[in-house]
């Protein structure tokens, strides 16, 4: 009941953003398709008018091949869900509400930005630049590939932390579900080792869920700059 009150889905267009950056059968790089399917079914049960899954990898150019390799294509076909390659989706220009970078506007995937309910479904992983990659970092992927190129270098040049804050300030996730069934530790987000974390976490507060996951992973979230700054600008609760 609390979930229904906080994130009403009935009659809404839902955009689900997993983390599908690369595939390696020996490493837990991508969001488990089972977790994505669980979110799809939850949204269907709640009466979503439309469900779209979208991703735009900054590492692999061929999303079709990547979807097949990681097993998500099968889930999408079986559930009759449309997929949007964010790297090629139409662009939506929006005033940058974060203003941490020097960018006056943020260019988003039109489908992601205009969705009624934006759901971030990341993997529980370490990251060599940001310490962790969770719900907040996952929304880096809804920035337009057509506007920023591949792999969205302009956002990197502005500073990853600044860009994460700006993106989330301008279009925050309405709901986050972190796949921590098998997480990644060490040299993430691509080359770390698997760890059986055995957790799934869901929240309508992207800062709180990232802070909780960070503590679970052994980090102090107050020492992770993008989480601390997102809390400071009012995007969620760090405590």
Q: Where in the sequence are the language-model features?
A:
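N-terminal and secondary-structure boundary signal
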Residues: 1-239
């Amino acid at each position: 009941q609390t979930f229904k009150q906080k994130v009403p889905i009935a009659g809404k267009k839902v955009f689900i953003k997993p983390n599908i950056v690369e595939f390696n059968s020996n490493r837990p790089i991508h969001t488990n398709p089972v977790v994505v399917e669980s979110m799809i079914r939850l949204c269907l049960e709640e009466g979503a008018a439309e469900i779209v899954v979208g991703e735009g990898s900054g590492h692999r150019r061929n999303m079709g091949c990547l979807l097949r390799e990681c097993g998500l294509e099968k889930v999408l076909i079986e559930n009759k869900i449309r997929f949007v390659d964010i790297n090629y989706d139409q662009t939506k220009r929006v005033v940058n509400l974060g203003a941490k970078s020097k960018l006056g506007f943020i260019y988003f995937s039109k489908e992601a930005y205009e969705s009624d309910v934006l759901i971030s479904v990341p993997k529980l992983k370490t990251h060599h630049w940001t310490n962790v990659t969770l719900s907040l970092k996952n929304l880096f992927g809804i920035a337009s590939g057509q506007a920023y190129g591949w792999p969205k270098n302009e956002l990197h040049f502005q500073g990853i932390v600044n860009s994460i804050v700006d993106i989330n300030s301008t279009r925050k996730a309405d709901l986050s579900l972190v796949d921590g069934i098998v997480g990644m530790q060490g040299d993430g987000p691509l080359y770390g080792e698997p760890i059986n974390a055995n957790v799934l976490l869901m929240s309508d507060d992207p800062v709180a869920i990232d802070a909780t996951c960070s503590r679970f992973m052994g980090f102090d979230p107050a020492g992770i700059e993008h989480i601390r700054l997102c809390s400071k600008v009012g995007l969620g609760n760090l405590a």
